[in-house]
């Protein structure tokens, strides 16, 4: 019953918002430029925070995360991983290299380290496939430069994966294609 009341209130609010946004200056300007309307609020991921068992307590593994983006940092902390950061730089290769170097320094203290970059996702959202290719190539160069460090210990498993597909063209933001995984 409470969920139904919440859904009804949210639906009412979203309808009001839709109509209010139709008349705003930004919307009128977007229409004049032939751009898609901005006429809704994103309500995904809404909910209450609840207790989550820590990753170390569930698996016995001590982990760290070196991620770009506050959401990944918060998620790491939520599940009991140590969140580390590097000084952000605009150069994709240098940024990823700094993350990998920090991972190398941290390896003796952790069972696994999650290194994340949003760079390919951000490039894909620009809908410029050349930009996405350049970002992936920059990440490859950074990874190649760090392979001696990552391959010196046979017990180290390096996994490269994508969290989701982001088309470089068309209207979709994310899509459902399979993503590559390299081990």
Tell what function each PLM region has.
Residues 1-183:
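Feature captures the catalytic ectodomains and active-site-proximal regions of enzymes
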């Amino acid at each position: 019953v409470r969920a139904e009341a919440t859904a009804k209130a949210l639906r009412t609010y979203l309808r009001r918002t839709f109509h209010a946004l139709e008349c705003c200056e930004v919307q009128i300007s977007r229409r004049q430029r032939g751009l898609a309307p901005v006429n809704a609020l994103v309500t995904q991921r809404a909910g209450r925070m609840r207790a989550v068992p820590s990753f170390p307590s569930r698996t016995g593994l001590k982990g760290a995360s070196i991620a770009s983006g506050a959401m990944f940092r918060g998620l790491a902390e939520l599940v009991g991983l140590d969140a580390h950061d590097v000084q952000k730089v605009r150069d994709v290769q240098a940024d990823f290299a700094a993350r990998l170097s920090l991972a190398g320094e941290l390896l003796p203290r952790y069972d696994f380290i999650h290194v994340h970059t949003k760079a390919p996702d951000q490039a894909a959202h620009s809908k410029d496939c050349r930009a996405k290719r350049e970002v992936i190539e920059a990440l490859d160069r950074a990874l190649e430069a760090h392979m001696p460090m990552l391959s010196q210990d046979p017990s180290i498993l390096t996994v490269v994966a994508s969290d989701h597909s982001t088309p470089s063209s068309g209207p979709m933001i994310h899509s459902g294609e399979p993503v590559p995984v390299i081990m």
